[in-house]
Regions:
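Short alpha-helical scaffolding segments that buttress acidic/His motifs in well-ordered protein cores
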Residues: 15, 37-41, 179
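Glycine-rich, charged/polar anion/phosphate-binding loops
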Residues: 39-43, 99-102, 163-166, 184
Length: 204
């Protein structure tokens, strides 16, 4: 645990303050801070205490750019499937072009670190386990003053044979949860959330 994370903070404060960060400073995240995040990740709940998660950490900007370009190719080819997800954030109309068509757009938002949470698909719960680990990692990052963002559009590219080979991911292992990590450029606006949708509250 880093010095910043040792400061007492209420767990709910960290939960409510976490936001997807899409603008990062150029400075890299140290190995010490990343190891603290990974330690938090592996303390996530896991079905039957299976602990299936494995991690790949990428801090090579040229490689991140190549993966970003490959992910954009795949997303553009599957545009009909992705639908509104390909619109620019906040766009309601059809006239706004997809950022995937912009050669300068980086799906990792120029963050210097990508953490890929992987697992062998040995049971029905490994996907949930990996995303629970991702949430722990993101909350720990927020507590340490770092920003994170889930990059779902990277999943398809990360699971292509050529990218898996470059990242050292075995063929029997699947990349499930790609999370960028970095030092935020300023504060991220807090976005109001919808209230919980309760289908039914059953009491005894």
């Amino acid at each position: 645990m880093t010095a910043t994370m040792q400061t007492e903070r209420h767990a709910l404060d960290v939960i409510y303050e976490r936001r997807a960060v899409r603008a990062y400073k150029a400075e890299d995240v140290s190995e010490e801070r990343l190891r603290a995040l990974l330690e938090a990740a592996v303390h996530a709940p896991t079905a039957m205490h299976h602990e299936p998660w494995q991690f790949v950490i990428v801090q090579n900007r040229a490689l991140l750019k190549r993966i970003s370009d490959r992910a954009k190719e795949i997303a553009t080819a599957q545009a009909a499937h992705h639908g509104n997800l390909l619109k620019r954030p906040g766009s309601a109309g059809d006239g706004m072009p997809s950022p995937m068509a912009d050669p300068g757009f980086n799906i990792f938002y120029d963050a210097g670190t990508l953490v890929v949470i992987c697992a062998a698909p040995t049971n029905d719960f490994v996907v949930a386990d990996c995303w629970l680990a991702a949430e722990n990692l993101m909350l720990a990052a927020r507590a340490d003053g770092l920003g994170t963002c889930c990059i779902g559009f990277a999943v398809a590219a990360l699971n292509t044979p050529e990218v898996k080979a470059e990242l050292g991911i075995p063929s029997a292992v699947h990349a499930y949860a790609p999370i960028i990590v970095g030092v935020p450029q300023g504060d991220t606006t807090l976005v109001p959330r919808k209230p919980p949708v309760i289908l039914k509250w059953i009491r005894g």
